[in-house]
Amino acid sequence: MIVGIPKEIKNNENRVGMTPAGVNELVKHGHTVYVQKGAGENSGFPDSSYERVGAKILATIEDVYAISEMIVKVKEPIAPEYPLIRKGQLLFTYFHFASDRRLTEAMMSSGATCLAYETVELKDHSLPLLIPMSEVAGRMATQEGARFLERPQGGKGKLMGGVPGVKPAKVLVIGAGVVGYSAARIAAGMGADVTITDLSLPRLRHIDEIKPANIKTLYSSEFNIRAELPTTDLVVGAVLIPGAKAPHLITRDMLSTMEKGSVLVDVAIDQGGCFETSRPTTHSEPVYEVDGIIHYCVANIPGAVSATSTLALTNATLPYVVQLANKGWQKACSEDEALYKGLNIVDGKIIYPAVAEAFGLPCETI
């Protein structure tokens, strides 16, 4: 198979879809790999590192799309890429369709096969291609939230861990999955007073058994969240319904109960955001204010630490990339139920129920 690795063009997206080690594996299996010039530079992989393992370097993104049967990316295609995608081409990347009707319609019109990292699902309901980036995003959410609590960044000037004689910051994490617990652990490590909420009592029970002393668990409800907000300095939204649009768990009227200069970090922004007042931001303009509350809603948080996150992502994706290249997507997906669940759009048809439901469109089967 001919596999293409384009350079990511989303704002400050520094990751790359495959490392030289991954290219080496594909070449060993007899596949041809084309890499766009400079695609890996911001993750620490110069063109020469790809050439040494057998990749061919192409000058433009147009060249990569034109020649490749399978495109391996990190983030969803954006508007300049839409005309480059053709019928029958396989795209393997994060899509997050449920929050983006324009992207969904563009991919349906293209006739391409869209296989989404975020909905590949194992029998135990874990999401193996989402977990590594969730771990990174959770850690980064707390780091960035702590930064924007600083006065020069517009925050209330509060130190996460406090000092002797001064209370630490209060952190509320909504959602106790991989993102949420990663965020809570980092906040606890910084010395903050942390509360983590979830609807799953078994999950909260598990966290209660392994958590440090400064993390408390709380059942997630509108009443409980509303009660926490007046004394909370930093909120991390870490809600996930696989493939579906995130619910709004903090509404605009709740902001008035918070102190000015408090910070909301919405890690669920890829799926539409879990705060009513959320809208996507970028690494170059990461925050905005609503009613005196700072909102950090960067849609590709791990792109800021690309050297780490590219390795973490490709460690997880490579076995699936090799399967797809060796067998073709039809055979690979028919033999691997987890991979089959990654199929979102095929030949103009939505086949993932949560995406169809998000837009009131029919869900087909293949």
Where is each model-derived feature located?
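An N-terminal-biased, well-structured beta-alpha scaffold segment characteristic
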Residues: I2-S110
